């Protein structure tokens, strides 16, 4: 996934991957992580997700990383949140009371920024990468997360040959094969969400499974 591709999607507002509501799996399963209210939570490739507002409402300190500047700016403007902007290395840092967003490349995000996180949430990051780059991202996520940190991973799976991503199809087998070295993996739920995704229906995708996993960094 080239940076230019992602920037173009946001510039043209072709952001079908953006959810207008908080993810139901997040609402249902977040409490199973049993994290304290003041825990720091890392959200990779966060976009302008409302899920970050949900996490902040639980009392958490949210640390997000997003490549596209427009996505970050829209998060604060859409939610009417005041923010302060500063440069931090090669990343731009946007800060409000409980949410800090770092705009830039996740592969160059300093490990020091996530050194104190105890939780993480990946709904749109892993599935944003084509298979050729996905394992590299998974290793970078593991590098950024402290040992013992826990989080939720949400994936989509469908016949990839029917529709090109993003979001890309990530199977349970891929998750187990590529993440088990760095994470303990506990599948929590899986459901067919085809009816809720008109783009996939229009392209005659026969099924679309959304799954949620509880991960713990080894």
UniProtKB/Swiss-Prot annotation:
Where it sits in the cell: the answer is:
Cytoplasm
Q: Tell me if Cytoplasm is a UniProt keyword of this record.
A: yes
- Residues annotated to bind S-adenosyl-L-methionine: 10, 45, 66, 123
- Give the EC class as a word: transferase
- Reaction catalysis annotation: S-adenosyl-L-methionine + a thiopurine = S-adenosyl-L-homocysteine + a thiopurine S-methylether
Q: What Enzyme Commission number does this protein have? A: 2.1.1.67
| Protein keywords | Cytoplasm, Methyltransferase, S-adenosyl-L-methionine, Transferase
Q: Does the keyword Methyltransferase apply?
A: yes
Membrane spanning stretches: none
The protein's matches in Pfam families, at most eight in alphabetical order, are given as: TPMT
- GO molecular function (one): thiopurine S-methyltransferase activity
Q: A GO CC term?
A: cytoplasm
- What are the recorded Gene Ontology BP terms? methylation; response to metal ion
Q: Kindly report the protein's main subcellular placement as a broad class.
A: cytoplasm
Report the sequence similarity comment from the record.
Answer: Belongs to the class I-like SAM-binding methyltransferase superfamily. TPMT family.
* Protein name according to UniProt: Thiopurine S-methyltransferase
Task: Tell me the organism.
Answer: Shewanella oneidensis (strain ATCC 700550 / JCM 31522 / CIP 106686 / LMG 19005 / NCIMB 14063 / MR-1)
């Amino acid at each position: 996934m080239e940076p230019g591709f992602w920037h173009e999607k946001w510039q043209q507002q072709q952001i079908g991957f953006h959810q207008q509501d908080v993810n139901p799996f997040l609402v249902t399963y977040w409490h199973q992580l049993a994290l304290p209210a003041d825990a720091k939570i890392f959200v990779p490739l966060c976009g302008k997700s409302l899920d970050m507002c949900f996490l902040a409402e639980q009392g958490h300190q949210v640390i997000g990383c997003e490549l596209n500047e427009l996505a970050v700016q829209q998060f604060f403007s859409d939610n009417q949140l005041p923010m302060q902007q500063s440069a931090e290395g090669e990343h731009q840092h946007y800060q409000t009371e409980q949410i800090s967003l770092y705009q830039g490349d996740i592969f160059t995000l300093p490990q020091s920024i996530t050194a104190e996180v105890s939780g993480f949430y990946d709904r749109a990051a892993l599935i944003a990468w084509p298979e050729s780059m996905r394992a590299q991202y998974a290793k970078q996520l593991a590098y950024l997360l402290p040992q013992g940190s826990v989080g939720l991973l949400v994936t989509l799976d469908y016949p990839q040959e029917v529709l090109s991503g993003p979001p890309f199809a990530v199977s349970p087998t891929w998750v187990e094969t590529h993440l088990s070295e760095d994470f303990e993996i506990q599948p929590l739920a899986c459901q067919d969400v085809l009816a809720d995704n008109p783009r996939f229906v229009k392209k005659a995708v026969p099924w679309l499974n959304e799954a949620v996993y509880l991960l713990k960094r080894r």
